[in-house]
Amino acid sequence: MGSFIYKQLLTNSYTVELSDEIDAIGSEKTQNVTINPGPFAQTGYAPVEWGAGETNDSTTIEPVLDGPYQPTRFNPEIGYWILLAPETQGIVLETTNTTNKWFATILIEQDVVAESRTYTIFGKTESIQAENTSQTEWKFIDIIKTTQDGTYSQYGPLVLSTKLYGVMKYGGRLYAYIGHTPNATPGHYTIANYDTMEMSIFCEFYIMPRSQEAQCTEYINSGLPPIQNTRNIVPLSLSSRSIKYQKAQVNEDIIISKTSLWKEMQYNIDIIIRFKFNNSIIKSGGLGYKWLEIAFKPANYQYNYIRDGENITAHTTCSVNGVNEFSYNGGSLPTDFAISRYEVIKENSYVYVDYWDDSQAFRNMVYVRSLAANLNTVICNGGDYSFQVPVGQWPVMSGGAVSLQSAGVTLSTQFTDFVSLNSLRFRFSLAVESPPFSITRTRVSNLYGLPAANPNGGRDFYEILGRFSLISLVPSNDDYQTPIMNSVTVRQDLDRQLGELRDEFNALSQQIAMSQLIDLALLPLDMFSMFSGIKGSIDVARSMATKVMKKFRNSKLASSVSTLTDSLSDAASSLSRTSTIRSIGSSASAWTNISSQVDDVISSTSEISTQTSTISRRLRVKEIATQTEGMNFDDISAAVLKAKIDRSTQIDSNTLPDIVTEASEKFIPNRAYRVMDGDEVLEASTDGKFFAYKVETFDEVPFDVQKFADLVTDSPVISAIIDFKTLKNLNDNYGITKAQAFNLLRSDPRVLREFINQENPIIRNRIEQLILQCKL
């Protein structure tokens, strides 16, 4: 829309596309989201890219289907199915107890007429009768002899299309599948000394625990899962199941590498983590039956323990994240028991424990890699909390439990009252446990989780045993310490100062009367327009943000807002677009003639409010005198205004930050502009919405783009403080005169204050929405 409008203009000087400027400013905006886990649990460092990241849980989960493995000879463990998956016919399995049982399994392909075949079994050539009458299915047969030189007898068979065969040693027997799919089931052979029998397997195979026998039967009858049928699965050697053990000391400090100034140290350390929860219980006023809040709070805990004969002093900070909020309301009477909000941690929550001790590992915990930890699980049980109401039996909240499982470890920084500590943050995920919690004498019962009422359950602390390891880059001289503490403290102090400034600014906005807030909302709207094309001024304002908030609170600007906006309105109404303006050919001369109309204001520039009025009048001239022959209001702001301000003796570099704060691009970012043609108004916003309507009835009419473009070049352009929807709502519910409508369309601050003083909810709500954007 913006580019189409300006294409209609005669542009023989510097031009700026409004839509491009809006997009550019919008792309530079950032939104800060603050996560506050507690004043003593701020994370100062994120995990480095070359760190270990998440640590795996130490629990070993036995797979359902382990394999495939390459053909081999081994003694299978008792109670495990060996699932054979041969590709071709022939001998697939041999096993013997070397005394009275020689056992082998043969696979016969489809459609085989009875014939004698020669196989090599246990190193000897044997003739075995082979037959398979099925046209589509394969056949496994078991052959057994009882003496080394005896003859084989056939048993089984197993007929199926999946070409799978299962065998297992268990309970003094050798189990093997027999029958016909889909009803194949395990059969068995009694064999002495079965536990010492080794098996020679001549095809790929899998291993399954006996507990998964039902799944094994399903595979025999229906086939392996699809992932096992791909040719990308490569069988491994059975030796890959072996575990290589390495002996290591419990606590180690190992030098990995060393240069002249730095060395890498690997620390393998056992730790004892003790922590406790803290809470805040706030009772409401009144008769004593209402509770306002029961919430978790960060808790510090310091303790000592012995590690390898050394007395260790440790410090932990426990905080929670992702709490669940509950409430209970027993009724509307003042004597009805009620809790407005109480917090519960459940399976969607996390517990953070920041750990530090006085050992060598934590002295230089700055440049760290290969960070890993293994911790035990702990169960946290809630205790009882009695709500002491004035009369009657006390309701009691009791029960609740969660288990904490280690979910990772990162670096962090703890800020105590005296020092900042580089520490480790252990993150724990939660699972709900029994018993559930309830509140006696209420409907609250059988809810799972750990409530904040008594999360420690009368214990002094919870304890977790574990071990962590890391590699740290430290100075070669052990007496030196990595100089990081000061910079951390400076950053923390700066954050606190900025937070205080924001709080002061927001508190100020709440203290100013509503009428002044209206004026305050109008002022940055004009400031935004003035500086929208002057990047340098905005950069100055950004760099002076904190200075602005300090000065703004103590200056006369807040008390002079009403006078200032009155002067804005006067400047706008007194301006006449004469033929002299139209005949001007250069931007500079146009500015000179326009500025001469406000010379009466320039004489007094001692106060910030007067200087602001001077700029604002020039600004309003810029907005009203939109398009002349050869220039538009963006041309004035970009090509002329900055040069004039830079040369002005009344406006210096220290005044600009006082007027244009970092909020100059945040106040009312969704701008809307309107032009008026008689009793018809055309309105277009920066987000692409547009309206056309009659002033008297506020009935919408078709929006004529060409007419809007022509009016922009030849009519005043007004910033739309009260938008079309608000005006129409006001007219439909209260009715307004034509004069009031025109004043609202012109954003006359006097008229706006009149509506506010009359407690008009529609205008008040609109202004409050704009003011909400003024908060930092």
UniProtKB/Swiss-Prot annotation:
Motif extent (DGE motif): 308-310
Keywords: Capsid protein, Coiled coil, Disulfide bond, Hemagglutinin, Host cell membrane, Host cytoplasm, Host cytoskeleton, Host endoplasmic reticulum, Host membrane, Host-virus interaction, Membrane, Outer capsid protein, Viral attachment to host cell, Viral penetration into host cytoplasm, Viral penetration via permeabilization of host membrane, Virion, Virus entry into host cell
Disulfide bonds: 203-216, 318-380
Coiled coil start-end: 491-511
Positions of region (Spike body and stalk (antigen domain)): 248-479
Residues the record marks as site: Cleavage: 231-232, 241-242, 247-248
InterPro entries: ConA-like_dom_sf (IPR013320), Rota_A_VP4 (IPR042546), Rota_VP4_MID (IPR035330), Rota_VP4_MID_sf (IPR038017), VP4_concanavalin-like (IPR000416), VP4_helical (IPR035329)
One Pfam assignment: VP4_helical
Span list, region Spike head: 65-224
Positions of transmembrane segments: none
GO cellular component, one term: membrane
Region (Hydrophobic): 389-409
Positions of short motif YGL motif: 448-450
Database matches in Gene3D superfamilies: 1.20.5.170, 2.60.120.200
Annotated region described as Spike foot, given as residue ranges: 510-776
Gene Ontology biological-process entries: permeabilization of host organelle membrane involved in viral entry into host cell; virion attachment to host cell
Motif KID motif: chain residues: 644-646
Protein family (similarity comment): Belongs to the rotavirus VP4 family.
Leftover remarks: In group A rotaviruses, VP4 defines the P serotype.
Descriptive protein name: Outer capsid protein VP4
